[in-house]
Amino acid sequence: MISEENFQQHTPMMQQYLKLKAENPDILLFYRMGDFYELFYDDAKKAAALLDISLTKRGQSAGQPIPMAGMPYHAVEGYLAKLVQLGESVAICEQIGDPTTSKGPVERQIVRIVTPGTVSDEALLPERQDNLIAAVYQEKEKFGLATLDMTSGRFQLCEPADKETLRAELQRIAPVELLYCEEFNEMAAIEHCKGLRRRPIWEFELSTAITLLNRQFGTKDLRAFGVEKSPLGLSAAGCLLQYAKETQRTALPHIQSISLIQNQDCIQLDAATRRNLELTQNLAGGTENTLASVLDKCVTPMGSRLLKRWIHQPVRDVEKLKQRQQSIAEILNFDLVDELQPYLQLVGDMERILARVALRSARPRDLTRLRTALEQIPALRAIVQQKTPPFLTALFSQIADFSEQCDLLQRALIETPPLLIRDGGVIAEGYNAELDEWRMLSDGATQYLENLEKRERESTGIDTLKIGFNAVHGYYIQISQGQAHKAPIHYVRRQTLKNAERYIIPELKEYEDKVLKSKGAALALEKQLYDELFDLLLPHLGSLQLASLALSELDVLVNLAERADTLNYVMPTFCDEVSVKIKNGRHPVVEQVLKDPFIANPVELNHNRHLLVITGPNMGGKSTYMRQTALITLLAYIGSFVPADSARIGPIDRIFTRIGASDDLASGRSTFMVEMTEMANILHQATAQSLVLIDEIGRGTSTYDGLSLAWACAEWLSKKIRSLTLFATHYFELTALPEQLEGIANIHLDALEHNNTIAFMHAVQNGAASKSYGLAVAALAGVPQSVIKLAKQKLTQLEKNSSYSAEQQIQALREANHNQGELFFEQETDALREAIEKLDPDDLSPKQALAYLYQLKKMVG
């Protein structure tokens, strides 16, 4: 903190800088000085380290040298992009005063703040990925979460029921910035997020949030958006909107509504499931060999982003899914893929261009790309109208007629404008008569100067005479030193060079003033006309946004049709029974990376067969089989066709996976602890409509502990939850479960062993695996034969000396299951036991005793 005394010791310019810096102490300040952005003090040191730019010193202020770093204004976007990628925020300070009239430092002010979550510049954004900012609020054990996509205006809120649901939502949306209240006390749920920003409690005040939101949407209340009964979500949304306004320093007209995300509307995927299924990110953190990498061949960036949102948020509305399916079928039946995609490709990223139009930050080439996008709509509409597919026709009903706006941009802009309006040459000839006049005057200078040069050369007889221009001295007549003595008396010397003299004459000076005025006037008028284009487009922003959303959806549907045709996918059907029946299903990703043909496999889960115990060798394909079942189910619930011969799928509310685990070193949790935490979440959250994948539960502890836990988990899922479950295990003892419990069946993935080698068949068969292939897999992995031989000897010895054979262990578990059936009844009898213990028969009348007996009978069903 700089004291008043120290502040006064600084130069006026540095005082101005320090005042602006004090407004934004926690972020970098880019301070405009002429053609450069400069950073000072700690900002300079930090920027020099992050951007690999030179750290210098700028004289002294208050008796101390000033650390300084900077970059040219025309190169700032590249530096901003790097800083944003590193999670930094930057305040942009511009000169708004006129240097020629300013007394003291030129007036400056912060015009915008660039943060990772509020950027809209094309160069700063990942093209095919949403760039979201979120805010989270907490009251007791409940949460409110709001998200905003500044590049589209999409504004949503939800109220996660608990911290696990909050963690899953944050994993889904992956915000690049997260605002949280200073009183937030569940940091473990958000500590994995990028760009954490602590905000004061008053920014989450509910009444302020409602007022702010109503003012933004021009409404009296929020009932039309269906969010009025979500106070925690609204508190988060209010903070988020206020932050967006603070950083942008302008109106946000593209944020026109807010919607509520209802958990019951979507299939819930927890963080572990998203990770294990490798939807958009693989286990190594990359994007290769993910579901999105196979499925996403969209021709527009906005379509690609929409598809990823569908993948991460499968919907349960079967009617909506059937509409998507029928649209895909129409595209295939009418052979529309090749017809529609070339036009869609030219639509480009209309969604983000419109956001920049709303923020009035769109550059000339943004507007020409918008023009190109609007030019494609009639052609796309004509193709659809010619074939009249009902679902696609309904989709096109959301796209208005933009011929007027398209004509405006065609008349106003040249074909290929320069990057920035400051360079001029953006507005087309014929659009504005006054601009054409100014341009004619300035553009006519070349011919006039050629004529003047010819005339002066002839009148003076000086053959080296020529007319030129530079930014410092303006127009001049140049004569070589050898002929300078011939210069007429009315030539006024302007500059002496080593080999020439430069002069000015009244006529040339007068023309210079006229030309410079015309160029300045033309540029000023061009900027004014450019700004007026925003005024003419903004009244149509809402309908343009609806059109961009419809075109995004069309791109996704055409893409899914192309994928279905290319990859041999089929349309799944939906049914009312909780079930999954897939004939010859394939893993959508693995089949694309395998050199050999993929072995397709069936799966059938229903009320009478709701848990499959899967055995077989490691590397035999158990994990692939389970994942493909989940991915096929997920694909069905985004409306896509699926990799199978047929698929019939019933209602699913959640997908859980407990597949693979490793130590969580950062949190100090072992593999076993990670495994048990994920398993506990499944046992608490799963329902009879959940699809549950369990792979090798019980590792990382003693054999008997692991076996007991695996058996108990399988039994609980089968008896108490009755979810649709695939339960892969290396405990052969669990294959006895079907004999003990209804609804459980054994399946296995087979392998063939011959002469110490093993061949994996990858084909699912009914029944349990005949044996374990652990030693054969170890040999395949390259374990020395001497070690394998020793292991076989030890295995024989252990089996011989074991106090329990495998059959005896299974029998013991059967008896334990029979004798301890009450364990699963304990929770239900706790209340009954407590009621009886509190009962005092001597205090009851006969009528009260009879009533109490009926109550106890009701408790036991």
Curated annotation (Swiss-Prot):
Pfam families: MutS_I (PF01624), MutS_II (PF05188), MutS_III (PF05192), MutS_IV (PF05190), MutS_V (PF00488). The keyword ATP-binding applies. Keywords: ATP-binding, DNA damage, DNA repair, DNA-binding, Nucleotide-binding. GO terms for biological process: mismatch repair. The keyword Transmembrane does not apply. GO terms for molecular function: ATP binding; ATP-dependent DNA damage sensor activity; damaged DNA binding; mismatched DNA binding. This protein is involved in the repair of mismatches in DNA. It is possible that it carries out the mismatch recognition step. This protein has a weak ATPase activity. Belongs to the DNA mismatch repair MutS family. NCBIfam families: mutS1 (TIGR01070), PRK05399.1 (NF003810). This is DNA mismatch repair protein MutS. The gene is mutS.
